Amino acid sequence: MSSALLEEVGWDADFAIPVANAENKALEEQIRKKQKDILNLDNKLNKHKDVINALTEHLKNLKQEVSHNQALCKAKEKETESEVHLKALAERETGRLKQEITRLESQLTTLNEKKNAQENSIFKATQKIDELTSQLNWDQQTLEAFLQESAHKDEDTMAIIKYAKQDERKIKELTLNIEKLTLESNQKRKTLDNELTETVTSQIALDKTAESFRQAHTERQELISQWENTIEQMRKRDQDIQQCAMMLAELNQTIREKNDLIKERKDFLEREIENNKELERNIGTVERQAFRLRQQLQEEEKNQRRLQDEVEVLKGTVDRTATDVETSRSQLSSMKKDIQDKTTKVEEAQLHNAALEEKLRMVTEAVLNGEEQAAQMEQLLREQEQNIKEIDSQLLRQKELLFKKSQEVQALRDKEKNVTAEICATRTALSNLDSKLRKLDQNFLQQQMIISNQDFQIQMLERKTLHLQGKVNTEEKKALEKKVADLAASLEEKKKTAANLNKQLKKLQDDIRCIKKDTEKIGAEKTNLSTKIQEVELFIETSEKERKKSRLKKQDSMVEKGLLKMEVQRLRNLLYDRADGVLTLEKRRLQLQTAMKEREEEIRVHREMLNKQVKLTEQERQGLSAAVNEAMSKIDKQRKRYEVLSVSLAPPEGEEDKSQAYFIIKAAQEKEELQRKGDELDAKIRKTEKEIHALENTLQVVNNCNSTHRKALTKVTESSPAHQEKLKLEEQRRAAEEKYKYKRRQTQELQEDIESMSNTLEGLLQEEKVLNEGIERTQAHVLSLNKDILSQEEKINRAVKQCAKYTKEIRSGKQSTEKTFEERDIELRELRDFNKSINKMLLDAMEGNPELSSILQIHFTQAGLSLPSPSSTPSSRLSSKPSSARSSASLHRSSNLSASSSPRSQSVSSPQMKTVDLGLGLSVTSPRGSQPSSAGSSRSSSKCKSP
């Protein structure tokens, strides 16, 4: 795998394959673990997806089953509703029929009553007619008799004619009324017959429709039972499918696990092959490194043995210096006691010294002129400069050696980073020993310089004494020798006291210098710490503000996130509702299509049945109407025949009335029965026509619904408003999802920033705690150092007072208030040192800022001076050390060159030298340095310049 990748990259086969370090290996291991976790999660995800798919399929089946059950329930409900409807129709029909029967019965009773009344009126009219006819017959007979008897009475005859005419009119009116009533009764009989026929036909149609409804009900029950059987079979099939889906998911899971295991083993095999190759390469490199490290170890062991030898030597020197320090401390304590004893002797010797100095001054003025003194001083300066050059060369050698040692130590540190703490401890010990070695070298050089200066002074004094001895007589020579011996003894005592004082003063100066350095370092550290604390506080404040801002942003983002979630949920719910609505509409469309097909089939069958029934009823009606017409014609014929027969036969009165009423009643009953049947048939026909009209209306409604659903299910065009609204909603959903992702990423970044800020804040708080502890320690150290400074200042003040006292005594002994030659010489040397330090400072500044060289050149040319060059600095630095005191200061400065070379430090450490003239041609030069014998005199000379 790696070889293929390297070939793709274009890696040269001559070069070694790059090997990952420990961190990258750990990252690769983490990546492999993450990939393994990702594979496991993918397997789980696929498993869950399979389960979800199986559950969704099962849910779909359940929904389908529920929909089937709902449809079955709806069918049952429709069946019950249809049964209730049929029952209600039957009840209404029975109620209507009962009402119709009651109405017909009431009409029948009223008609019977009317018929009876009419028959009674007809019977009475016939009786009256009979009576009238009988009366008429009688009247005619009587009239004939009367005419015969009373022909001559015209008035009576006219009256009788008049009454006869009136009777005839009444008879005509009554006959007309009888005819009208008979016509009305015939019409009512006809209407009754029609109603009877209609009722009969409607009853027949109702019976047929009821029979068809019963058949449809039984067919529906059979269909529902078949539907239940199919649903049960589908449920069983769904259970089988669900079991198969679960088994399929398990099989897929096992297949995925086996594939993952195979893939993991393949990856493991490839990794092991790569690891073996990498291990072989690493073994080769490690063997080569081990060989190099063995060689380096041998070299380091040699260096370590050499350094251990040097450490042992340095330990011996440290022990010796410790013993010297202890002895010097004991001598200092004894010298403090001797000072009090010798101060009295010094006072006595000062009086004697004054006289001797006066004599010595006179002798020196007589013997030595200014040129000889200048030559001597130049010779002294040359010798001192030669000594200083030698010391500087030694210092340079030591510095080079120190630089080499530091380079070696740095190389060792670079090579041995993973060594034990013991080697680190030895390094720190070596660095401490190096510093002690440098201090001891400085002390050794200072001692050599002091010894050389003392030898030179002794030679000078011997020259002076020899010169003086050649020009004095024996008595004076003896006296002078005696005085010289006394003065030498006093000089030795004074040297001892001066040495002790110089030791004390040097110690005090060293302590003060160290304390000042420590205080400066502590002050610098304090300022740095205060600035760091301020920066930390500012950082804490800014981080707190940023944390608050981030918290507010986080809250806003959380609110926006919640709003986005709500919006997304709303849109999702809307989308799901739309999808559910589409699914429900699709299902509804399918259901309506099936129901519509069933209903159309039922309507078609019912229509055909109704058409057949209408045809049958029409045929029956036509047959009945033909039969009725025939019956009516027969009745008319029979009635006419009956009238003819009744007129012809003329039965007796009682029989005639009875037979006529009987036949009339019988004919009326038959007619009424036929009318009732006709009415029933007409009602059935009207009902079926209404049902056909209602079914046509429902069919129209179903067709309209189907057309609307067909329009709803047709493919939406891109220019339609529904499609535009859908695109708009999808765009809003995408924008909301992108905004949600951006906000979630922003919240994650803010959380990471907050975590990093909290980590940095914790680190800063820990640093602040550590710094506070360091500040407290430094403050305690500063307090202790301040106490030491106060005690040392008291000692310095006492020493300064003593030095001032000595200078006054020396000037009073010389009887001069002006500065002595030695003091002027010291001032000259200080000015030279100051000039050289200024030149060095300018050169350092020009090295740091090259643009200053032109400006300084202009100022120097205006002042008539030459700009110092870098080549003159070593000689100037060497020439700035004319005495042993300046050599110690230069050593101190050279030891601090790596840190800083400020003029202030140089001016503080500028050497001073005081030459004490004893009046006998003997002078003692006391330089300032690190040695106790020179420190006191230099300090006293620097303090005694201006009494």
Swiss-Prot record:
Residues 866-947 are annotated as: Disordered. Residues 16-194, 221-402, 471-522, 582-813 form a coiled coil. This is Coiled-coil domain-containing protein 39. Keywords: Cell projection, Ciliopathy, Cilium, Coiled coil, Cytoplasm, Cytoskeleton, Primary ciliary dyskinesia. Residues 866-911, 926-947 have a biased composition (Low complexity). Disruption phenotype: Defects are the cause of a phenotype related to primary ciliary dyskinesia (PCD). Embryos display heart-looping defects at 36 hours post-fertilization and bilateral or lack of spaw expression at the left lateral plate mesoderm in 14 somite embryos, consistent with compromised fluid flow at the Kupffer's vesicle due to impaired ciliary motility. It comes from the Eukaryota. Belongs to the CCDC39 family.
